[in-house]
C-alpha cells in the first residue's frame, strides 16, 4: 500500500492547509473530527516549526490556511502564527469555538492581519447547545465573540454541525446567522468519522428529517440571496453519490496535526499500514509529492471496480477512503455511500435502524479517555 508506484500521478499544487495547532479545546462535542487518541500539549509543534511549515506551504502554492484545533486560540502563540500567515500572503481563516480566551485575543489577531473567522455554534437554544458542546455558559460567550468579529469588520462564517440533537433547529440556525451579521452559514450534516463514528447511534437523524432540513436550506437560499450564503453538506449515509473527500486524496488539501504529522484528510490515521511523514523529518513539499500516505490513493490507478470504469471517478475520486475502510473493511473499496457500491443498501438500512432507536448518551470528546465504540457490528461483516 505504501510503496509509490512508478507511474503514480503528478501531485497538483495544494490549495489549502489545515493547521491543527492543538487538540486542546474547552468544548467536548460528540461529533468532533479529531482522532480518538488526542495529541497532548507536551508534544505540540513549537512556534518556529509552525512558522517554517507556513513558509514551505506558501512556497508550495498554498493559498488558504485554516487555523484550527481543537481550539487554536488556546495556543499562546496564535497571534504570532497568524502574523506569519499575513507576512507570507496566506489567507488566514480562524476556526474557533469563540469561548475561553478567544475573545481576549481577537483584537490582536485582527491587528496582525487575520482575514476570516469561522465560528462553531452547536445549537440555537442555549440549553441544547450546552448539552451538545458539553460546556456551561458557552452560548453568551459565542454571541459576544461574534458581535466583536462583526464590529471589527471581519467576515464571519457560522458553522453548524447538524445531527438528530439539533436538526429541528436548522431554520433557527439560519435566522441566527442573519441576526449575528454572518456572511456565510455552513449547514454541515455530521460526517461519521472520529468521535462522530463512536457516537453515530446518538447522532443519526432519520431520512425525513434530513429531507426537511434540505428543503429549509434551499428555500432560505432563495429568500436570502445577496444577504447570506448558505453551504450545505448532506449526510453520506443518505446520499446517492459520495463526496470527493478533501477534494480528492492528495489533490487540494493537507492536514498538519499538532505533533507535525501530515495527513491527506482528518481521519487518515484510521487506515492501518499508511506511513505518515512528519514536518520534523521532511520538508512539506517532499511530503506532499512523495510521502507514502499521499501517493497511496492519489489519482485513479488504485481504484477497483465499479470506480475504475465509472464516469464519476474524477468527480468524487471514489469517495472517502476512511469510510470505505470503516464500512466495507477495505480502504480501496468503493465508498458504501455510493449507490453503485454493493453495500449501499445495507448502509442505508443501518442508518434507518439507528435513527429509529432511542439515542444513547453522548460519548464526549476528552483527552486521555480510553474510548471504545458502542456501535453494532458493521455492514461488511
Curated annotation (Swiss-Prot):
<dbReference type="InterPro" id="IPR000385">
    <property type="entry name" value="MoaA_NifB_PqqE_Fe-S-bd_CS"/>
</dbReference>
<dbReference type="InterPro" id="IPR017200">
    <property type="entry name" value="PqqE-like"/>
</dbReference>
<dbReference type="InterPro" id="IPR050377">
    <property type="entry name" value="Radical_SAM_PqqE_MftC-like"/>
</dbReference>
<protein>
    <recommendedName>
        <fullName>PqqA peptide cyclase</fullName>
        <ecNumber>1.21.98.4</ecNumber>
    </recommendedName>
</protein>
<feature type="binding site">
    <location>
        <position position="29"/>
    </location>
    <ligand>
        <name>[4Fe-4S] cluster</name>
    </ligand>
</feature>
<comment type="pathway">
    <text>Cofactor biosynthesis; pyrroloquinoline quinone biosynthesis.</text>
</comment>
<keyword id="KW-0949">S-adenosyl-L-methionine</keyword>
<dbReference type="Pfam" id="PF13186">
    <property type="entry name" value="SPASM"/>
</dbReference>
<keyword id="KW-0479">Metal-binding</keyword>
<dbReference type="GO" id="GO:0009975">
    <property type="term" value="F:cyclase activity"/>
</dbReference>
<dbReference type="GO" id="GO:0005506">
    <property type="term" value="F:iron ion binding"/>
</dbReference>
<dbReference type="InterPro" id="IPR013785">
    <property type="entry name" value="Aldolase_TIM"/>
</dbReference>
<feature type="binding site">
    <location>
        <position position="25"/>
    </location>
    <ligand>
        <name>[4Fe-4S] cluster</name>
    </ligand>
</feature>
<comment type="function">
    <text>Catalyzes the cross-linking of a glutamate residue and a tyrosine residue in the PqqA protein as part of the biosynthesis of pyrroloquinoline quinone (PQQ).</text>
</comment>
<dbReference type="GO" id="GO:0016491">
    <property type="term" value="F:oxidoreductase activity"/>
</dbReference>
<dbReference type="GO" id="GO:1904047">
    <property type="term" value="F:S-adenosyl-L-methionine binding"/>
</dbReference>
<dbReference type="InterPro" id="IPR023885">
    <property type="entry name" value="4Fe4S-binding_SPASM_dom"/>
</dbReference>
<keyword id="KW-0560">Oxidoreductase</keyword>
<dbReference type="Pfam" id="PF04055">
    <property type="entry name" value="Radical_SAM"/>
</dbReference>
<dbReference type="InterPro" id="IPR011843">
    <property type="entry name" value="PQQ_synth_PqqE_bac"/>
</dbReference>
<feature type="binding site">
    <location>
        <position position="32"/>
    </location>
    <ligand>
        <name>[4Fe-4S] cluster</name>
    </ligand>
</feature>
<feature type="domain" description="Radical SAM core">
    <location>
        <begin position="11"/>
        <end position="223"/>
    </location>
</feature>
<keyword id="KW-0004">4Fe-4S</keyword>
<comment type="subunit">
    <text>Interacts with PqqD. The interaction is necessary for activity of PqqE.</text>
</comment>
<keyword id="KW-0408">Iron</keyword>
<dbReference type="InterPro" id="IPR007197">
    <property type="entry name" value="rSAM"/>
</dbReference>
<dbReference type="GO" id="GO:0018189">
    <property type="term" value="P:pyrroloquinoline quinone biosynthetic process"/>
</dbReference>
<comment type="similarity">
    <text>Belongs to the radical SAM superfamily. PqqE family.</text>
</comment>
<keyword id="KW-0411">Iron-sulfur</keyword>
<dbReference type="GO" id="GO:0051539">
    <property type="term" value="F:4 iron, 4 sulfur cluster binding"/>
</dbReference>
<keyword id="KW-0884">PQQ biosynthesis</keyword>
